[in-house]
Amino acid sequence: MSRISILAVAAALVASATAASVTTTLSPYDERVNLIELAVYVSDIGAHLSEYYAFQALHKTETYPPEIAKAVFAGGDFTTMLTGISGDEVTRMITGVPWYSTRLMGAISEALANEGIATAVPASTTEASSTSTSEASSAATESSSSSESSAETSSNAASTQATVSSESSSAASTIASSAESSVASSVASSVASSASFANTTAPVSSTSSISVTPVVQNGTDSTVTKTQASTVETTITSCSNNVCSTVTKPVSSKAQSTATSVTSSASRVIDVTTNGANKFNNGVFGAAAIAGAAALLL
């Protein structure tokens, strides 16, 4: 019986050693890993309470879930109190104190090893990260290519538009120039045609008549010069005491210039009389001047 007992004890020891050597690999964010980390963290707070108080006084923004305070003073029975804390919050708290690397990290590693737990980033997370990086790189490349293509297209479009605008401007300029030349040519042609028509259809012939309209103001004399069939006639109307007499006589071509001069002189005198008849004794000066001019033709 003793041999059986010894063998049984030996088998139990071997089984225990085998069980202890079995390691379970878990994610750092697994709940069992988080609970082990929190257990070490709470125990460290209880053992170094004054350090944590001083740290919290210097870092007002470092907050702790109320479950941590309850666990510290629970006397070691706090496992169920910490199940609601997220993995990100656990990581923030344990790595936020200055003694994490010198004291907490080693204690957490030892506690995980005692439980047969090894932590590693899951393959799916790595693949997802790699895939995300690859997709991001591909998207960036595609975006860059798209941007370059868009920029090139915009540049080509702008160049094409500029070319079209330039061509349109050139065409418009050509059309405007052509239209201007056409209008100028048409106007010149019309002017030339009018001049030609005037020269051919309205020559100064012996049958045309030229007249000088008389100017009569306040009963003063007036002179009318008419040209008919190359003959110059001079008509002189003289008025005195409301009785007027008219004399018409032909003059030679030599006298024509004289008659024209008389007409011009008479017109000037009449103009003066018109501008102020009362200033010249009711036109007496004007009548005398016309009579004197008419005497030159007799």
Swiss-Prot record:
Extensively O-glycosylated. The GPI-anchor is attached to the protein in the endoplasmic reticulum and serves to target the protein to the cell surface. There, the glucosamine-inositol phospholipid moiety is cleaved off and the GPI-modified mannoprotein is covalently attached via its lipidless GPI glycan remnant to the 1,6-beta-glucan of the outer cell wall layer. It is a lipid-anchor; GPI-anchor. Keywords: Cell wall, Glycoprotein, GPI-anchor, Lipoprotein, Membrane, Secreted, Signal. Residues 276-298 form a propeptide. Induction: Induced during anaerobic growth and completely repressed during aerobic growth. PROSITE patterns: SRP1_TIP1. It is found in: Secreted, Cell wall; Membrane. This is Cell wall protein DAN1. It comes from Saccharomyces cerevisiae (strain ATCC 204508 / S288c). The gene is DAN1.
